[in-house]
Structure formats: structure tokens, C-alpha cells
């Protein structure tokens, strides 16, 4: 996939503007030009030989780690709203990982689609594949919040068209309205406490998940990165002779 960045070709006038800004100069930018520069395998077809030689021993070591096969995916899994195989799987892993804090899975698992950056393809799973899917240093956070705020969380998920969830079922409209929600098949009770296993990024209220800020309690075990938890899950399933799989279960149903 080609990626682009904006390259300023004519920036002299801009530099002059900053230089004289404190003097209230009459200089003004009259023209700015730029072009899109594709950044792909053709951008630098002749790598620097000296740099390559310097990096070679490090690359060999990294490659030996990144290409290590840790499991097998039963099918290809991608992300996508309102529900997807990959987001269901990762949300399940988070929910199960809450056992290290609670002694049992959380009531709900939650991961944002934006945190899943690649496809898990059918076949061998390498460490590198997991880094491609989960490149961020997100960590497990288990938050405890009242049902009234859990409903607000569901409304935010509905407004975004769906996110990765586990342990709950939502009914939403195409326009992003919440029609109904259940936790473990039961309606949400406003004053009851519920546990949500998510990542620190969302627990901080990012990606519109502001309801999580209202948590009564927040537990974030040190060193429990989402990537590490997912790696552990894959290796545990593999040791048990199982392939990595997922299912579409109608966790978020869109109704007219």
C-alpha cells in the first residue's frame, strides 16, 4: 500500500514570516507549493550498503524472533464494524485476561477497531504477525463501573457504529442509536457494578469512551500489554492442540 506525506517545495516565504512575526513585519505568504511523494518499495531502490552492513547482525536477530511461528489461524480474520472475527477474538482475549485481576473473566471485554492494524491471515501465525496487528503498547485495564455508566458506554459504541465487544450484546440503528443491550443475556441494572476489561487508552476516555472515566475502580496490572496477552493466548491454544478461531455471533446487531 502506498503512503504519502506532504513535501514543502517552496518554504522560504514561510520561514521569513516566522522570523519577522515578533516585529509585526508586513511580510506575508503569497504562494505555497507542494506535491505528494509516494513512500513505497520504489522510493529508495538502492539501500546504502554501509548502513545495511551495520544493521545486518541486528536484523538477523530480530528476524529470528519475528518469524517464529507461535500458532495457526483456522481462517483469515479482519476488523470491521459493527462486528468482526478479529475484534471478537481480541475482545474475548481481554475479557479472559481479566482473571489475573478478578480471579474470573470480566463481565465485558472492549477493544477499539482503530487499535487493530492488520489482518490475521489463515495459516501460520508468527510473532511478527501479532506485532503487525497490535503494534501499540496498550495495556490491560479492568474498570468497575455502575450500570448507568455502562449504558452510556454502550451508547458511545453505538454512535461509532460498533467496536470489539465480548460478553455483551447490543442492538443499534444504522444512524448510531442504541436500541437495547444485555450483559450475559440480562438487562443492565443502573446501580449494579459491572467489570469491563479494556485497554488503558480506552480506560482514559479516548475514542469517545468517556463513560469509562466514571469507574468506581480501575486495575491495570503492570506489564500486561494487549500484545503480550494475545501472544500468550495463541501459545496456550497451540499447546492444547487448538487452532486460533473466532465466530460472528451477532454481538452488535444493526436494525433499521
Regions found by a protein language model. Name each.
Residues 47-74:
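N-terminal, Lys/Arg- and Ser/Thr-rich interaction peptides
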Residues 64-81, 209-215:
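Acidic/histidine-rich, surface-exposed loop or edge segments in extracytoplasmic proteins
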Amino acid at each position: 500500500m502506498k503512503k504519502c506525506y506532504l513535501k514543502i517545495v517552496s518554504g522560504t516565504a514561510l520561514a521569513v514570516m516566522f522570523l519577522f512575526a515578533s516585529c509585526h513585519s508586513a511580510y506575508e505568504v503569497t504562494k505555497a507549493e507542494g506535491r505528494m511523494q509516494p513512500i513505497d518499495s520504489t522510493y529508495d531502490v538502492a539501500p546504502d550498503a554501509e548502513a545495511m552492513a551495520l544493521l545486518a547482525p541486528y536484523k538477523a536477530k530480530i528476524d529470528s524472533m519475528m518469524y517464529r511461528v507461535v500458532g495457526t489461524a483456522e481462517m483469515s480474520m479482519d476488523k470491521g464494524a459493527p462486528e468482526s472475527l478479529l475484534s471478537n477474538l481480541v475482545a474475548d482475549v481481554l475479557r479472559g485476561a481479566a482473571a489475573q485481576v478478578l480471579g474470573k473473566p470480566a463481565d465485558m471485554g472492549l477493544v477499539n477497531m482503530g487499535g487493530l492494524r492488520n489482518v490475521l491471515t489463515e495459516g501460520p501465525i508468527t510473532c511478527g504477525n501479532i506485532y503487525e496487528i497490535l503494534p501499540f503498547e496498550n495495556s490491560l485495564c479492568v474498570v468497575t463501573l455502575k450500570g448507568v455508566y455502562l449504558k452510556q458506554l454502550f451508547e458511545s459504541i453505538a454512535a461509532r457504529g460498533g467496536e470489539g465487544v465480548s460478553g455483551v450484546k447490543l442492538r443499534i440503528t444504522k444512524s448510531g442509536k442504541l436500541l437495547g443491550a444485555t450483559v450475559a443475556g440480562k438487562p443492565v441494572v443502573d446501580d449494579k457494578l459491572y467489570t469491563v476489561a479494556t485497554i488503558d487508552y480506552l480506560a482514559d476516555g479516548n475514542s469517545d469512551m468517556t463513560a469509562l472515566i466514571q469507574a468506581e475502580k480501575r486495575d491495570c496490572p503492570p506489564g500486561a500489554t494487549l500484545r503480550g496477552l494475545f501472544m500468550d493466548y495463541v501459545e496456550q491454544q497451540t499447546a492444547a492442540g487448538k487452532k486460533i478461531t473466532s465466530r460472528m455471533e451477532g454481538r452488535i446487531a444493526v436494525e433499521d
